[in-house]
C-alpha cells in the first residue's frame, strides 16, 4: 500500500532559474511524511534526491506517493515518488531512526510502529 499526499508549490519555493529549489524537495518529503506518520517519533538519518524533471510555478499541485522500502530494529527506509500529473519529477529516499523524546537517543521500533510500517512495506 502507498500513502498519497498532495503538495502545493509556492512562489517562495522557486530559485533564480524559475523552478523549485533543490532543497525544497526535502521540505515536500517532510510535509508528506508528517501527514503519513506523525505518530512515530523519528529523525532523518539520511536523505537522497534523484531530480528527474524540473518543477515550475505553474505546476501548483505535486502528487507524492510514500512507501516503506526497509524495516530494521530502530530504523526504516522511506521512498517518495513526486509527480506532476503523470510525469515523475523526483524520487526521494530517506532513512528514519526512531528516537526517545525523553533521552533524545535511538530506540527500537515498538509493535504498533512496526505494524503500521508493515502496511506500507514494498520490497
For every predicted segment, state its role.
Residues 1-61, 69-123:
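Terminal targeting signals and extreme-terminal segments of soluble enzymes
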Amino acid at each position: 500500500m502507498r500513502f498519497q499526499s498532495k503538495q502545493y508549490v509556492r512562489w517562495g519555493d522557486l530559485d533564480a532559474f524559475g523552478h523549485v529549489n533543490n532543497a525544497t524537495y526535502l521540505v515536500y518529503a517532510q510535509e508528506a511524511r508528517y501527514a503519513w506518520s506523525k505518530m512515530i517519533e523519528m529523525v532523518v538519518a539520511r536523505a537522497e534526491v534523484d531530480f528527474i524533471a524540473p518543477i515550475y510555478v505553474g505546476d501548483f499541485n505535486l502528487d507524492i506517493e510514500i512507501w516503506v522500502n526497509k524495516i530494521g530494529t530502530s530504523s526504516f527506509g522511506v521512498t517518495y515518488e513526486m509527480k506532476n500529473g503523470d510525469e515523475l519529477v523526483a524520487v526521494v529516499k530517506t532513512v528514519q531512526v526512531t528516537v526517545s523524546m525523553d533521552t533524545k537517543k535511538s530506540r527500537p521500533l515498538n509493535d504498533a510502529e512496526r505494524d503500521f510500517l508493515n502496511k506500507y512495506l514494498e520490497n
